């Protein structure tokens, strides 16, 4: 029971991929050969790759860990070997206090350098994983901006008002229903991008990775909020137009 509750609190990469694939099918059926359908296809491939990468991210780099262990053992062994070569009794007998102090200072510096090298090797796996995740999160951020560009010229007021376009106006061939579905698809894709980013946060405790994931989630939330504002405007304008009474026939027309 407790194990099931634990899994219920974890995002399932397979379910997210299925949701993205279903959304791609919906967009392709509603808007075939559109730019948004192409973006949805690319997002599907990215979602599938993300699911595989997240699984690999949780696995240890065995070779790198063995190398780190060997480096640590070699560093400790080298320190012990050098220490055993020194006749400390003879050093204390012959050296003056200043010489002893200088010698101890050199030994401390060597130890600090050795520990710094060991720390570098031990954290190498974490830094490699962080670099890879940051690169993938940058890719998701780019997707979010591409989706925002697709909805940028979709103006609900222009669709309902029927105003005459200028020569530089973007093409507006969508009906009210199509525009509503288009904007809704954009909002769904942004939400799924946030979920894909959250998959990386679920596999690491790296503060930098978690901060980058939060940035992606904040970006998609802000862009999605703009889209939902357009959807609300579209709905409100449509309701206002529906409330306008139809013109009554004049006496000459009756």
Task: Report residues per predicted region.
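Cytosol-/stroma-facing membrane-proximal "stalk/adaptor" domains immediately downstream
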Residues: 192-254
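Alpha-helical transmembrane segments and their immediate juxtamembrane boundary regions
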Residues: 52-128
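Short, charged cytosolic
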Residues: 4-18, 23-50
């Amino acid at each position: 029971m407790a194990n099931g509750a634990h899994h219920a609190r974890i995002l399932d990469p397979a379910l997210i991929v299925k949701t993205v694939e279903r959304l791609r099918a919906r967009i392709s059926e509603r808007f075939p050969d559109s730019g948004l359908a192409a973006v949805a296809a690319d997002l599907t491939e990215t979602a599938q790759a993300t699911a595989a990468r997240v699984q690999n991210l949780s696995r240890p780099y065995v070779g790198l860990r063995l190398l780190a262990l060997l480096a640590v053992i070699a560093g400790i062994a080298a320190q012990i070997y050098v220490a055993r070569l020194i006749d400390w009794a003879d050093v204390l007998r012959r050296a003056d206090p200043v010489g002893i102090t200088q010698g101890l200072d050199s030994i401390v510096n060597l130890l600090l350098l050795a520990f710094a090298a060991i720390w570098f090797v031990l954290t190498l796996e974490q830094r490699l994983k962080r670099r890879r995740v940051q690169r993938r999160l940058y890719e998701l951020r780019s997707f979010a901006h591409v989706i925002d560009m697709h909805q940028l010229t979709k103006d609900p007021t222009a669709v309902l008002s029927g105003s005459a376009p200028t020569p530089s106006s973007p093409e507006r061939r969508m009906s009210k229903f199509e525009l509503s579905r288009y904007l809704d698809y954009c909002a769904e894709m942004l939400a799924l991008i946030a979920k894909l980013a959250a998959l990386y946060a679920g596999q690491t405790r790296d503060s930098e990775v978690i901060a980058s994931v939060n940035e992606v989630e904040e970006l998609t939330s802000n862009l999605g909020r703009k889209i939902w504002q357009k959807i609300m405007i579209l709905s409100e304008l449509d309701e206002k137009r529906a409330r306008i009474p139809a013109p009554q026939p004049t006496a000459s027309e009756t």
